[in-house]
């Protein structure tokens, strides 16, 4: 039996490959990385260049294997064994695996694959092996799609491998919307852009005619909320990712709107509205235009973020005299403070898993990205810098991306990622200064 699932945006198709004599235990093999907060030794793995089934696939076969290896190595949980150490040379996707050769170089996981290309159509097949158990880890899979989507296919392979070995969801086949910046610090031009999670395939969504801030994906990834100063004052806008059609939301004379974020239903938007010197949190139904005020306080209340089930909102407020984090029911109600440490807290964002809240903290002249439980317990600071701010969660809720900016006139903003243990801090490779990242859900 073959199972197909069409992936409309990129024209990808997924199929199961059913090899002969796959052990029943292969679905639940012993190979497993247990993700904890302690120090771990990265799991050694090998990804030989995929087999090119025809001449037109040679370059793609090499490039796909490199992207897969980079995805896994970049997590800090895996360590690639370089090709120069390989004993076996994989020349056929269907050839038996020489487990002894891979054990000899201590490869605990092995990914093999093949690529065929015909015109604009590319087909990639792959299998994941638990080397020390002498068996496949799950069924083989096949992805098919256009040549322009080859990186997505590679990311999908890496997602499957990551998920099977760690038991956690992957996050490689995703995109990040961000603000691309240019010019001096005191006169920066800013425009919206999107990229693959690893910094590849940058595409610009707006020009630099007006300042844009705080983009946020919808739960389905097909729309983006953002704040623009196109009228001279901050206002929130909604953009369709496919057509780039844009419309204003919550427009009302004499007000400023900013810090928008979608509810999990994809229809409701929470945001801040400033009027007459007072800033409160509101919601807006993007279909009907119905607006509702959730807070009513003389303090500044902003940066709302929904819990994954949509029942609660975390936000920042200075109602206690300093900038702190609070949680309230999604329909409004009495908030409860969850941040209790020294310093100022802001930009809270709820993990897609629902277990943690990430935030920015300013304390003793330093900025930090941190996480805490939803009741405020177990606060952990993951980074420290002159300026770290604005965390966003990967789809699996185990990695954060944020903005880091250096001191002085020459300090340019850049995007960094870190896992929730604080171990794997990395700069996202971009050729332009960048800020305000927001991760998409996994692509369909």
From Swiss-Prot:
<dbReference type="Pfam" id="PF04052">
    <property type="entry name" value="TolB_N"/>
</dbReference>
<comment type="similarity">
    <text>Belongs to the TolB family.</text>
</comment>
<comment type="subunit">
    <text>The Tol-Pal system is composed of five core proteins: the inner membrane proteins TolA, TolQ and TolR, the periplasmic protein TolB and the outer membrane protein Pal. They form a network linking the inner and outer membranes and the peptidoglycan layer.</text>
</comment>
<dbReference type="InterPro" id="IPR007195">
    <property type="entry name" value="TolB_N"/>
</dbReference>
<dbReference type="InterPro" id="IPR014167">
    <property type="entry name" value="Tol-Pal_TolB"/>
</dbReference>
<feature type="region of interest" description="Disordered">
    <location>
        <begin position="281"/>
        <end position="311"/>
    </location>
</feature>
<feature type="signal peptide">
    <location>
        <begin position="1"/>
        <end position="26"/>
    </location>
</feature>
<dbReference type="GO" id="GO:0042597">
    <property type="term" value="C:periplasmic space"/>
</dbReference>
<comment type="function">
    <text>Part of the Tol-Pal system, which plays a role in outer membrane invagination during cell division and is important for maintaining outer membrane integrity.</text>
</comment>
<keyword id="KW-0131">Cell cycle</keyword>
<keyword id="KW-0132">Cell division</keyword>
<dbReference type="GO" id="GO:0051301">
    <property type="term" value="P:cell division"/>
</dbReference>
<dbReference type="InterPro" id="IPR011042">
    <property type="entry name" value="6-blade_b-propeller_TolB-like"/>
</dbReference>
<protein>
    <recommendedName>
        <fullName>Tol-Pal system protein TolB</fullName>
    </recommendedName>
</protein>
<dbReference type="Pfam" id="PF07676">
    <property type="entry name" value="PD40"/>
</dbReference>
<feature type="compositionally biased region" description="Polar residues">
    <location>
        <begin position="281"/>
        <end position="310"/>
    </location>
</feature>
<keyword id="KW-0732">Signal</keyword>
<dbReference type="GO" id="GO:0017038">
    <property type="term" value="P:protein import"/>
</dbReference>
<dbReference type="InterPro" id="IPR011659">
    <property type="entry name" value="PD40"/>
</dbReference>
<keyword id="KW-0574">Periplasm</keyword>
């Amino acid at each position: 039996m073959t199972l197909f699932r069409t992936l409309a945006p990129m024209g990808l198709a997924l199929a199961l490959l059913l090899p002969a004599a796959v052990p029943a235990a292969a679905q639940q093999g012993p190979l497993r990385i247990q993700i904890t907060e302690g120090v771990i030794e990265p799991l050694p793995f090998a990804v030989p260049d995929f087999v090119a089934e025809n001449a037109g696939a040679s370059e793609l076969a090499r490039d796909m294997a490199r992207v897969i290896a980079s995805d896994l190595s970049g997590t800090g949980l895996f360590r690639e064994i370089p090709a120069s150490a390989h004993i076996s040379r994989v020349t056929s996707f269907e050839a038996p695996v020489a487990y002894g050769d891979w054990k000899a170089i201590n490869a605990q996981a092995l990914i093999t694959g093949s690529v065929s290309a015909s015109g604009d159509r590319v087909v990639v097949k792959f299998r994941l092996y638990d080397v020390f158990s002498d068996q496949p880890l799950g069924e083989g899979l096949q992805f098919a799609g256009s040549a322009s989507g080859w990186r997505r296919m590679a990311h999908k392979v890496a997602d499957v491998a990551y998920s099977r070995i760690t038991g956690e969801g992957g996050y490689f086949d995703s995109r990040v919307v961000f603000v691309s910046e240019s010019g001096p610090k005191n006169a920066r031009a800013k425009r919206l852009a999107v990229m693959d999670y690893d910094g590849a395939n940058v595409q610009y969504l707006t020009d630099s005619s007006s300042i844009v801030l705080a983009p946020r994906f919808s739960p389905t990834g097909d729309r983006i909320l953002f704040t623009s100063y196109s009228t001279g004052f901050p206002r929130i806008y909604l953009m369709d990712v496919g057509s780039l059609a844009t419309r204003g939301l919550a427009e009302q004379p004499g007000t400023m709107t900013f810090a928008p974020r979608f509810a999990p239903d994809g229809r409701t938007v929470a945001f801040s509205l400033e009027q007459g010197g007072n800033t409160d949190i509101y919601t807006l139904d993007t279909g009907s235009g119905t607006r509702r005020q959730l807070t009513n306080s003389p303090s500044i209340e902003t940066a709302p973020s929904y819990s994954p089930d949509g029942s609660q909102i975390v936000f920042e407020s200075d109602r206690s005299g300093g900038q702190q984090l609070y949680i309230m029911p999604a329909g409004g109600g009495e908030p409860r403070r969850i941040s209790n440490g020294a310093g100022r807290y802001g930009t809270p964002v709820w993990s897609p898993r629902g277990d943690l809240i990430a935030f920015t903290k300013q304390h003793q002249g330093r900025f930090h990205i941190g996480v805490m439980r939803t009741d405020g317990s177990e606060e952990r600071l993951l980074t420290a810098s002159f300026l770290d701010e604005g965390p966003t969660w990967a789809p699996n809720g185990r990695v954060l991306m944020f903005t880091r900016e250096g001191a002085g006139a020459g300090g340019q903003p850049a995007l960094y990622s870190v896992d929730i243990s604080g171990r794997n801090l990395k700069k996202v490779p971009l050729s332009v200064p960048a800020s305000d990242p927001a991760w998409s859900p996994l692509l369909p």
